[in-house]
């Protein structure tokens, strides 16, 4: 029986002044261990999701932890039957998660970490303002009970949303969460810089909560969007039933895929009447490349979804 693929989400805010020089040895470590996926490195730290065999993931983690700066790198795992990534990349960035506000640095100032087992008690406090820091298409398929949806399409929009809707003098306690912990960690640093006093964030993010909190005690509702070809995971971290529309990025349900407006790789019920002609042509061309690659048994182009392929068969 084939061993399951290990999917590891990892990040750490840590000052890496030599991050440019880290790119090539890190890429080689990924290749040596048979790792697929993308890691982002910047002066503020490292972030990404990768996949491989049990031995491969352990080998990469050992390589990272050999650097004293990354010995306690945050790391969460889930499993799937098919490789969710097709390429191996290390990218140099200005930020490992882009907020776009100069001076916000979780290495210098960050909110209070809340362990998954303590999260329910915190968000049950009526004085706590609970904010989902993810984008609208992620929130649409699952979130915590009572969470506020900022309806952002990019994390860059988060600061403007906070300034427009909340006042540090009125909102004393704020709790935030995101998929793996990185966005809310940076968001907490931003909110502290804006004068909010008590800022909390879920340590390890939604994925760690789903891993550690029994479903019968959970305050999570729905699936959790993930940034690989699984698209979503359920509460037990098994792969969900959603695909993703590669024209608009929106997760599409089984019901969505039964719609006359769903064309794999090209449109879905959420975007079929909103796409520009340029975007539509680009989606059609990409889908043709995917079909050609499949016919030739070649590596899949960017944008390919193996579940979408099997549903078409």
Swiss-Prot record:
EC number: 1.14.-.-
Reactions catalysed: uridine(34) in tRNA + AH2 + O2 = 5-hydroxyuridine(34) in tRNA + A + H2O
Catalytic residues, chain numbering: 178
Keyword Nucleotidyltransferase found: no
Gene Ontology molecular-function annotations: oxidoreductase activity, acting on paired donors, with incorporation or reduction of molecular oxygen
InterPro entries: Rhodanese-like_dom (IPR001763), Rhodanese-like_dom_sf (IPR036873), TrhO (IPR020936), TRHO_N (IPR040503)
Superkingdom of this protein's organism: Bacteria
Keyword tags: Oxidoreductase, tRNA processing
Keyword Nuclease recorded: no
Alphabetical GO biological process terms: tRNA modification
Pfam families attached to this UniProt entry: Rhodanese, UPF0176_N
Sequence ranges assigned to domain Rhodanese in this UniProt record: 124-218
Family, similarity comment: Belongs to the TrhO family.
Function in brief: Catalyzes oxygen-dependent 5-hydroxyuridine (ho5U) modification at position 34 in tRNAs.
Name of the molecule in the record: tRNA uridine(34) hydroxylase
Species of the source: Pseudomonas fluorescens (strain ATCC BAA-477 / NRRL B-23932 / Pf-5)
Taxonomic classification: Bacteria, Pseudomonadati, Pseudomonadota, Gammaproteobacteria, Pseudomonadales
């Amino acid at each position: 029986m084939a061993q399951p693929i290990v999917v590891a989400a990892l990040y750490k805010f840590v000052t890496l002044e030599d991050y440019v020089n880290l790119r090539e040895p890190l890429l080689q470590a990924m290749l040596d261990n048979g790792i697929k996926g993308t890691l982002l490195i910047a002066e503020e730290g490292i972030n990404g999701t990768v996949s491989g065999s049990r031995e491969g993931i352990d080998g990469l983690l050992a390589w990272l932890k050999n650097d004293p700066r990354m010995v306690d790198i945050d790391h969460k795992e889930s499993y799937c039957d098919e490789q969710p990534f097709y390429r191996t990349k290390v990218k140099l960035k200005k930020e490992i998660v882009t907020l776009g506000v100069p001076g916000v640095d979780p290495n210098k100032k960050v909110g209070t970490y809340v362990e998954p087992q303590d999260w329910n008690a915190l968000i049950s406090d009526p004085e706590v303002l609970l904010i989902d820091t993810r984008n609208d298409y992620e929130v649409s398929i699952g979130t915590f009970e009572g969470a506020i949806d900022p309806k952002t399409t990019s994390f860059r929009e988060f600061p403007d949303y906070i300034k427009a809707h909340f006042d540090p003098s009125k909102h004393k306690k704020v709790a935030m969460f995101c998929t793996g912990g990185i966005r809310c960690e940076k968001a907490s640093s931003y909110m502290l810089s804006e004068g909010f006093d008590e800022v909390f964030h879920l340590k390890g993010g939604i994925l760690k909560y789903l891993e550690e909190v029994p479903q019968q005690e959970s305050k999570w509702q729905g699936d959790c969007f993930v940034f690989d070809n699984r698209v979503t995971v359920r509460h037990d971290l098994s792969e969900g039933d959603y695909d993703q529309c590669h024209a608009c990025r929106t997760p599409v349900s089984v019901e969505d895929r039964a719609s006359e407006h769903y064309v794999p790789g090209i449109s879905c019920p959420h975007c079929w009447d909103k796409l520009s002609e340029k975007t539509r042509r680009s989606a059609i061309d990409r889908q043709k490349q995917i079909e050609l690659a499949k016919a030739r048994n070649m590596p899949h182009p960017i944008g390919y979804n193996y579940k979408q392929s099997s549903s078409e068969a």
